[in-house]
């Protein structure tokens, strides 16, 4: 009878699958070791927001078909940030802080939308390191990984992106 009960439970929304994939990519140790992103709440947020920005842009590239999944991805991001902030005890100013985090995601999306071969290093530096000094080899590692992620996302169908087949 488990299949009968499984049908009664709503399936995980596709947005949460894509968001879970983004979280899995952002948790990869290479960002914090070879990439030297600080392994702090802010550093982990920077990686997650950067990965989500690249996924959002890939969804956006599919035009109208990517609109609903893009909104759903953002909603999953907001719900997770809200839960994380509550867990950290930021209840008094939660709304303001979550709005700030969503604004940070939106600014990353805009920044990545305008990335060119000439400004990749600058965009990665701002997105992951917030203009902090970073060694050339460290920056090169992060640039390489983000270029690879962008290329992988671009090569997949919309369904595969939504299903997280890029993580």
Predicted regions and their residues:
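Surface/interface-facing alpha-helical segments and adjacent flexible terminal/loop regions used
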Residues: 1-167
